[in-house]
A protein has these predicted regions:
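RNA-contacting regions in translation and RNA-metabolism proteins
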Residues: 1-196
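Single conserved hydrophobic/aromatic residue that forms the stacking wall/gate
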Residues: 195, 200-204
């Protein structure tokens, strides 16, 4: 924020941050993805953060000892946001195959496949964290939509069955707890005793 006056002024805001400070192996360096948006339409949030010839972002990179930083444009449209999050890869299409489960297929040309995935999966992993979506990178020249949709439909069906079973179990547990509470309340009710007159012996 200190390097970008527009953030301090409020015309640019940071929407989300995904950082991998300790990658799974030494061959992959630390990396951060930052999603930004502008309050004012005429302000370019990405340009404001990067600065002229990368001057602003370079200062941040230097402070973080060379950590790679991707500044991407946030979007209300999940498909566009996912495409932006995979920068610097070029995306051909984003298919939101399961909006409820937040699962997307991202189609990229063959020459962009490794870039979209990133070394040891770092790029797509950070994109998924940033957007909150499960992202599957697909080769656009080999993508079989019908086959992929069938697989997704099966996964959705399994999820719905699991959710139904979970709901049934929760309802059963709630009913058992209610019955137990009712029984406990009944047992705690005070017992009233009726005093009967003591029997008297007849006098002869």
């Amino acid at each position: 924020e200190n390097e970008v006056p527009e953030i301090q002024e409020g015309s640019v805001r940071i929407v989300a941050v995904a950082r991998e400070a300790n990658p799974p192996s030494r061959s992959v360096g630390p990396r951060t993805k930052v999603a930004v948006d502008s309050i004012e339409r005429e302000v370019d949030p990405v340009g404001a953060c990067i600065g002229a010839r990368g001057s602003r972002i370079q200062q941040v990179v230097n402070e973080l000892r060379g950590e790679k930083i991707d500044v991407i444009r946030w979007s209300h449209d999940p498909g566009q946001y996912i495409a932006n999050s995979l920068s610097p890869a070029r995306v051909e299409m984003v298919r939101l195959v399961d909006p409820v489960g937040q699962h997307a297929h991202v189609l990229v040309p063959p020459d962009q496949l490794s870039l979209a995935i990133g070394r040891e999966g770092q790029n797509v992993r950070l994109a998924a964290r940033l957007t909150g979506w499960k992202i599957d990178i697909k080769n656009s020249t080999e993508y079989d939509q019908a086959a992929e949709d069938a697989v997704v439909a099966e996964l959705i069906s399994q999820r719905e069955q699991e959710e139904a079973l979970q709901m049934e179990a929760e309802e059963r547990l709630a009913a058992e707890q209610a019955a137990r509470a009712e029984e406990d309340a009944r047992l705690r009710e005070p017992v009233s005793y009726t005093h009967l007159p003591l029997p008297t012996s007849d006098l002869v």
